[in-house]
Regions:
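Short regulatory "switch" loops immediately downstream of catalytic or recognition motifs
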Residues: 1, 133-143, 354-362
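Short, intrinsically disordered, charge-balanced linker/junction segments flanking boundaries
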Residues: 17, 265, 270-271, 396-405
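N-terminal accessory beta-strand-rich subdomains and adjacent acidic, glycine-rich linkers
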Residues: 23-296
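Short boundary motifs at domain starts and secondary-structure transition points
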Residues: 26, 301-307
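Generic cytosolic/nucleocytoplasmic N-terminal low-complexity/intrinsically disordered segments
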Residues: 2-4, 94, 231, 393
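Aromatic-lined carbohydrate-binding/catalytic grooves of carbohydrate-active enzymes
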Residues: 307-405
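Alpha-helical scaffolding within the catalytic cores
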Residues: 292-301, 385-388
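Bacterial Sec-dependent N-terminal signal peptides
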Residues: 1-24
Length: 405
């Protein structure tokens, strides 16, 4: 046994203990089973040479376990046998913004691709996050869209018809037992200039392999009321990079998170490239319990501080004047009005800067190569001859913070 393996096994053994100020989170590898969790949940996985396969999710608060029958790795983008697998554990202390957490890193190499899966395990949280990093060379599978109309599909009469599918790179995967799953996906939209309906939900029964859009997937067994959720930590579906057309794939009780947010050329041989993240959480009950579990995870990412997280904002773009009105005199007058209205944050939108965006009231604006213009994000000397100092000083006097687009 190598020295490296001895160190890894030693770390695996000690991290079952509450060594970090009583924080109850753990991750350890024992035999062929990798376990990680806290007071709320545990995720158990077959080690599989460093390409873990989930075998169960346990809800410790209710004493219930969702068994899995996985054969494929949770994360899979290339074929091959994993080698050079390692497992390490580190505590990441709080930085004043996020809560402290245990980072369990599973690394392996498949062919010319190095993979690191960095799990984030928070105390007293019914969810475990995973950030994935890639380095080396990879040729990602390009899915050819099936453009057939549903009217052109034949009936399912034979087992072979049900086995058809596509190769799908997966961020995470739960290959579960049971035949009574009910699911709901939530899709979000941005670009409020174009969208006034920012959230849509779809409830569905998993059946034959199908795809779904959204950043959230909730699923529960309608008999046992045991449930789990996937949170895809990525932009909204309509604005993701290299979007494959969906975020989730379900095939009966096999649930997958898809869409890495990268292309093959984004993976470099000498630096790590991070793909979109994924969070897996558990709950028992209905919608309230599911949303509570999700919220408990979200509260780990950012400590709530009223001074910085709560605000009543006034924005200079609000009357659709674009950048035509914004200047020093206008902003000083707006601050007086903001104080009378109880505004706590005055936000200077597009137009305060020297660079001209394509949204300008006057022609000639552009975002092209703006990083090459070192003066782009400096105060416009014509509109703000004294810089932003008079605006900031008056804001402080009135108890109003100043924000910038």
């Amino acid at each position: 046994m190598s020295k490296k393996n001895i160190i890894t096994i030693f770390l695996s053994a000690i991290c079952t203990l509450p060594l970090w100020g009583g924080q109850q989170y753990y991750a350890f590898l024992k035999g062929d089973t990798l376990r990680m969790g806290n007071n709320y949940m545990e995720r158990a996985m077959l080690w599989n040479n460093g390409a873990p396969v989930t075998v169960s999710l346990t809800d410790k608060q209710h004493g219930k376990t969702i068994p899995a029958q996985g054969k494929q790795p949770d994360f899979s983008i290339v074929k091959g046998i994993p080698t050079d697998a390692t497992f390490t554990v580190n505590e990441i202390p709080t930085n004043g913004i996020h809560a402290s957490y245990l980072q369990a890193t599973v690394a392996c190499t498949i062919g010319s691709l190095n993979i690191e899966r960095r799990y984030r395990i928070y105390a007293d949280c019914p969810a475990i996050a995973c950030d994935t990093y890639l380095k080396g060379q990879v040729e990602l599978y390009q899915n050819k869209e099936d453009n057939r109309s549903n009217a052109d599909r034949k009936n399912i009469e034979h087992t072979a018809d049900m086995a058809t599918g596509v190769k799908t790179p997966t961020l995470d995967r739960l290959q579960l037992s049971g035949n009574h799953w009910s699911a709901r996906t939530i899709e979000f939209f941005d670009y409020t200039d174009w969208n006034d309906n920012l959230v849509t939900g779809r409830t569905w029964l998993p059946y034959r392999r199908n795809t779904y859009r959204g950043n959230l997937l909730f699923a529960h067994d309608v008999v046992t009321r045991q449930g789990f959720f996937f949170l895809k930590e990525a932009p909204s579906s309509s604005t993701q990079l290299h979007y494959p057309g969906s975020d989730f794939v379900a095939d009966f009780s096999d649930f997958m998170v898809v869409g890495l947010g990268i292309a093959s050329h984004d993976v470099k041989p000498d630096s790590w490239t991070r793909v979109y993240g994924c969070v897996t959480g558990i709950y028992t009950g209905g919608e309230q319990e599911a949303l509570t579990a999700l919220r408990l995870y979200q509260k780990q990412l950012r400590h709530h501080t009223a001074v910085q997280d709560e605000m009543i904002m006034l924005n200079t773009w609000g009357d659709r004047s674009q950048d035509a009105k914004i200047d020093e005199a206008f902003c000083l007058a707006e601050l007086d009005r903001a104080a009378r209205m109880g505004i706590t944050l005055f936000h200077l939108d597009d137009g305060w800067q020297s660079g001209k965006s394509p949204n300008s009231k006057t022609a000639g604006g552009s975002f092209k190569d703006i990083w090459k213009n070192t003066d782009y994000w400096t105060p416009n000397p014509t509109k703000f001859p004294h810089g932003l100092k008079p605006i900031v000083e008056k804001g402080k006097k009135l108890g109003i913070r100043i924000g910038l687009w």
